[in-house]
UniProtKB/Swiss-Prot annotation:
<protein>
    <recommendedName>
        <fullName>Protein VERNALIZATION 3</fullName>
    </recommendedName>
</protein>
<dbReference type="GO" id="GO:0010229">
    <property type="term" value="P:inflorescence development"/>
</dbReference>
<dbReference type="GO" id="GO:0048510">
    <property type="term" value="P:regulation of timing of transition from vegetative to reproductive phase"/>
</dbReference>
<dbReference type="InterPro" id="IPR036610">
    <property type="entry name" value="PEBP-like_sf"/>
</dbReference>
<dbReference type="InterPro" id="IPR008914">
    <property type="entry name" value="PEBP"/>
</dbReference>
<dbReference type="InterPro" id="IPR035810">
    <property type="entry name" value="PEBP_euk"/>
</dbReference>
<dbReference type="GO" id="GO:0010220">
    <property type="term" value="P:positive regulation of vernalization response"/>
</dbReference>
<dbReference type="GO" id="GO:0009909">
    <property type="term" value="P:regulation of flower development"/>
</dbReference>
<dbReference type="GO" id="GO:0010048">
    <property type="term" value="P:vernalization response"/>
</dbReference>
<dbReference type="GO" id="GO:0010228">
    <property type="term" value="P:vegetative to reproductive phase transition of meristem"/>
</dbReference>
<dbReference type="InterPro" id="IPR001858">
    <property type="entry name" value="Phosphatidylethanolamine-bd_CS"/>
</dbReference>
<comment type="function">
    <text>Involved in the regulation of vernalization and of flowering time; this process in essential for flowering in cv. Bd29-1 but seems do not occur in cv. Bd21.</text>
</comment>
<dbReference type="GO" id="GO:2000028">
    <property type="term" value="P:regulation of photoperiodism, flowering"/>
</dbReference>
<dbReference type="Pfam" id="PF01161">
    <property type="entry name" value="PBP"/>
</dbReference>
<comment type="similarity">
    <text>Belongs to the phosphatidylethanolamine-binding protein family.</text>
</comment>
Length: 177
């Protein structure tokens, strides 16, 4: 496959760290305010405090989707021992609508990276039908691949990620001369 090495999901190691290779078959649009998320773009923590608007493509409302948002770099990219950290989980999103029409299983938790540049990944799966998904007991050490297998979701149909790092002035120790 010729373009595989230029796929931003491969270059950004989302494919590998979070997902296996897949073919995008559905449109997924994520935006925070007026900023659309594109693969590898950088957003500041102050821009992502509120739940994003998520629009799902598809052909009809009788097809349902599951959206997962994870941080594979928690607590730090050099030692991601909490990989993956689950920030948001929404199921039963009807095709052609958005996440606000789905069932929120885990509420949105805004990214607050403390060290290094973190990737925040949105993954969309097509469901076989409406189904009951149980909230994981905790957010840390979530595994998108295992989750998809547990609920028989198959490969992802879309994914997008952004980078985010701590903003200057958002806490931490200050040194004064």
């Amino acid at each position: 496959m010729a373009g595989r090495d230029r796929d931003p999901l491969v270059v950004g190691r989302v494919v590998g760290d979070v997902l296996d290779p897949f073919v995008r078959t559905t449109n997924l649009r994520v935006s925070f305010g007026n900023r659309n998320v594109s693969n590898g773009c950088e957003l500041k923590p102050s821009m992502v405090t509120h739940q994003p608007r998520v629009e799902v493509g598809g052909n009809e409302m009788r097809t349902f989707y599951t959206l997962v948002m994870v941080d594979p770099d928690a607590p730090s990219p050099s030692d991601p021992n909490l990989r993956e950290y689950l920030h948001w989980l929404v199921t039963d999103i009807p095709g052609t609508t958005g996440a606000s029409f789905g069932q929120e299983v885990m509420c949105y938790e805004s990214p607050r990276p403390s060290m290094g540049i973190h990737r925040f990944v949105f993954v969309l799966f097509q469901q076989l039908g409406r189904q009951t998904v149980y909230a994981p007991g905790w957010r840390q050490n979530f595994n998108t691949r295992d989750f998809a297998e547990l609920y028989n979701l198959g490969p992802p149909v879309a994914a997008v990620y952004f980078n985010c790092q701590r903003e200057a002035g958002s806490g931490g120790r200050r040194m004064y001369p």
